[in-house]
Design a protein with these regions (language model features):
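Conserved catalytic-core motifs of GNAT/GCN5-like acyltransferases
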Residues: 111, 121, 128-145
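Conserved acetyl-CoA binding element of GNAT-fold acetyltransferases
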Residues: 70-81, 174-189
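Conserved acetyl-CoA pyrophosphate-binding loop and the N-cap/start of the following alpha-helix
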Residues: 83, 87-95
Length: 198
């Protein structure tokens, strides 16, 4: 397995094909080769995961400005179905974090479907995101087989990539961090009583 920056038109075409395979979207809803090209040339992050020479996953973010400071807007993280639940999404996000820090960003944001439990687990447990915004039907009608016919309501995830709580999350082997007045303490599992106390 290899993770690497994507820089060539042929690789961008593979990303477009992965978008169609992963989400089942029409060409109306894909991020196109010209947009991926500009993204890479103007400060975005585009990383692919390869199994031998086959691209099996990718993460893409666009440069942006929020409150006068540079951020990355992570628009897509996609993994082919047969490669899911093996830590590949997390590995891609950690690479995205490294590159975002290198170019001077403190914040990476993205939206995710609150009905997708696996995404919530990755975002909160593995990465340490916070959510302060719920966006109503943010993308309008989608051609995706996953979202077709439903509103595209989303949480807006904020990933403060230099913050200590994020460093603890991405370096932790535990499942959950519970914040207490004294300090944050990692635990291996979360009982119902502990969850209610949190």
């Amino acid at each position: 397995m290899e993770l690497r920056d994507l820089e060539r038109i042929e690789e961008f075409r593979q990303v477009v094909e992965l978008e169609r395979q992963i989400w089942g979207v029409d060409y109306d809803d894909v991020v196109t080769v010209p947009i991926l090209t500009v993204t890479v040339k103007r400060g975005g992050v585009l990383i692919g995961a390869f199994d031998n020479d086959r691209m099996i996953a990718f993460v893409s973010s666009l440069p942006g400005i929020k409150d006068g400071k540079p951020i990355q807007w992570s628009h897509m993280l996609g993994v082919l179905e047969e490669y899911r639940s093996a830590g590949l999404g997390r590995a891609l996000k950690l690479e995205q974090r490294r590159r975002s820090m290198k170019i001077g960003c403190d914040l990476v944001e993205w939206t995710y479907d609150p009905m997708q439990a696996a995404n919530a687990h990755l975002n909160f447990v593995k990465l340490g995101v916070v959510v302060e915004e719920y966006a109503i039907n943010v993308y309008g009608e989608s051609t995706s087989r996953l979202h077709k016919g439903t509103p595209t309501d989303r949480f807006v995830a904020q990933w403060w990539i230099r913050e200590p709580h994020v460093a603890r999350r991405v370096e932790s082997k535990s499942a959950v961090v519970i914040r207490t007045p004294e300090a944050a303490r990692p635990i291996g599992s979360l009982s119902k009583a502990a969850f209610q106390a949190a």
